[in-house]
Amino acid sequence: MGLLTGKTAIVTGAARGIGKAIALKFASEGANIAFTDLVIDENGQNTEKEIAALGVKVKGYASNAANFEDTEKVVNQIKEDFGSIDILVNNAGITKDGLMMRMSEAQWDTVIAVNLKSAFNFIHACTPIMMRQKSGSIINMASVVGVHGNAGQCNYSASKAGMIGLAKSIAQELGSRGIRANAIAPGF
């Protein structure tokens, strides 16, 4: 029996990369996995197959995590499909690097929307469910760049620093209700 047997985890941005690795690890510990990505293409289908081979329930959902309404819909669908939402991993993220003097407003806005606003969207949608369950775990994937900064990545750095602050604030808001919130900041 694994550490997460009987739990349902949402992992955003998990068709490949770090999100996929998180989903696979959680599944190996017995968690059922609902993962999202902008599209569920061949990568997403392969991720579904790999997770299913571990003997857990899995489904990939096409969703724009930066869109508030899309997120509300997909979270409601996941709750309907899986029955509970016990773990949320806010992993969706992108980079659009550039020096400040050359960075466009669109580069800034897109990175903040995908990396930070998406976490707000998913936390906002999952919080009522977790509150009714009186338990839950929210994990924000930040970065060492959110702590130390990095030249040419002011948008990415700001978004990841925001993920850390968001986790700290949510932990204070929801901790008394049995809901944990943490940030993980992988580094070089």
Give the role of each language-model region.
Residues 2-34:
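Canonical Rossmann dinucleotide-binding motif of NAD(H)/NADP(H)-dependent dehydrogenases/reductases
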Residues 31-46:
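Conserved glycine-rich Rossmann-like NAD(P)H-binding loop of the short-chain dehydrogenase/reductase
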Residues 41, 62-74, 105:
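The beta1-alpha1 cofactor-binding region of Rossmann-like NAD(H)/NADP(H)-dependent oxidoreductases
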Residues 99-100, 107-112:
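Substrate-binding pocket helix/loop in short-chain dehydrogenase/reductase
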Residues 123, 159, 167:
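Active-site helix of classical SDR
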Residues 128, 172-176:
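Alpha-helical segment proximal to the catalytic Tyr-Lys
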Residues 143:
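Residue(s) in the substrate-gating loop at a strand-loop-helix junction
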